[in-house]
Design a protein with these regions (language model features):
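N-terminal loops that bind phosphate or other acidic moieties
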Residues: 2-349
Length: 349
């Protein structure tokens, strides 16, 4: 579907399915709501899919790989060539995300949405990297829309193949710089308060990063009321691709798990494009990056994991999968009060 067609298919969650899922939880032979957020997230998934029965066995991590022109400003510890190296490691199951996917029984799909050179990673390339946002727009509006629609198309491929749960990941040297820029615009907060050290910058490197972001915002003057303009002016193709996945998941009734800081920026981008889309997103963890908790708060999300992670790739999102499996095992398998011959618990008044 096109971006506009996708937006038009996004509706509120199914209250009927959520009510049935809550009634199912309340009928299980245990204290009411004693599994806390684990109960809430399965009720949310019921609302997303419109079904009381929760099926999340077939799951995928979609990791969007892209390069960012702003690396010209010397804002990263690693060189741009690392993007392609790590992307190819996904295929060889050597990267962190690949190992975690194997452990969590998830399929990993790396996507070249805008790397500076071609690799063996499947190509859905919008361009060979973005332009340097510190000198002008990172991409055109047309490229921004194409990148969003690429994410939508990739997600729809997986949904058509039967995937019931998706997670978003990314790989792209310089993408904490673009993400910090977008976060500063969307949240209307000072750049220094939202910008972290990424993959490990020195204090001097962090100062260059902050200066580059402030310069990019000053030069491009992105309008926070137009999310696609914000993406085009100071964003990245990887962020756009992930946002497309969030939008497609919402349009097709498939839950999508958010990863860390960069994924949260993509989630907020999707929510600014289509507000109901945020109800279809599940937060996994709170990134170590300083803007992470502000982004989650803006989205009205509470994360499960607080591990001071800042690795990216979709690693935190994948770590949530086994937790969801355990919640679903109880939801599906535990005896009801009648089956256990226990008097039904009633809510306190």
């Amino acid at each position: 579907m096109t971006l506009q067609e996708t937006i038009e298919q996004i509706h509120p969650l199914s209250k009927e399915a959520m009510d049935r899922a809550k009634a199912h939880w309340d009928g299980i032979a245990k204290p009411l709501h004693s599994l806390g957020k684990l109960e809430d997230v399965l009720i949310q998934i019921a609302g997303i899919t419109g079904k009381e029965e929760i099926s999340i066995e077939k799951r995928a991590l979609l990791t969007f790989c892209a390069d960012n022109g702003v690396v010209e400003e010397n804002v990263t510890q690693s060189g741009q060539e690392v993007t392609a190296t790590v992307a190819e490691n996904f295929l060889q199951e050597k990267a962190t995300a690949a190992i975690l996917c194997r452990s969590a029984h998830a399929d990993l799909f790396p996507i070249d949405i805008g790397m500076a050179r071609d690799t063996k990673v499947p190509r859905y390339k919008v361009a060979y990297g973005t332009k340097n946002m510190a000198k002008g727009p990172a991409m055109t509006r047309e490229e921004a829309v194409r990148a969003l629609e690429t994410g939508i198309a990739v997600a729809e491929e997986k949904i058509a193949a039967g995937y019931q749960l998706m997670a978003t990941g990314e790989m792209g040297i310089g993408n904490t710089t673009t993400s910090s820029a977008m976060a500063a615009v969307f949240l209307n907060q000072p750049v220094p308060e939202l910008t972290g050290r990424g993959a490990g910058l020195s204090s001097e490197g962090l100062a260059r990063k902050i200066a580059a972001i402030e310069k990019a915002i000053a030069i491009n003057q992105p309008d926070p009321s137009d999310p696609i303009v914000v993406l085009a002016k100071v964003g990245g193709f990887d962020i756009a691709g992930m946002a497309g996945v969030f939008l497609a998941g919402a349009a097709h009734g498939v839950p999508v798990v958010m990863d860390g800081f960069i994924s949260c920026v993509a989630a907020l981008l999707a929510a600014r494009i289509a507000p109901f889309a945020k109800d279809y997103m599940i937060a996994s963890h709170v990134s170590k990056e300083p803007a992470a908790h502000l982004l989650l708060a803006e989205l009205g999300k509470e994360a499960f994991l607080h591990c001071d992670m800042c690795l990216g790739e979709g690693t935190g999102a994948i770590m949530l999968f086994p937790i969801l499996d355990q919640a679903n095992a109880v939801y599906r398998g535990m005896a009801t009060f009648d089956e256990a011959q226990i008097e039904t618990y009633v809510p306190l008044t």
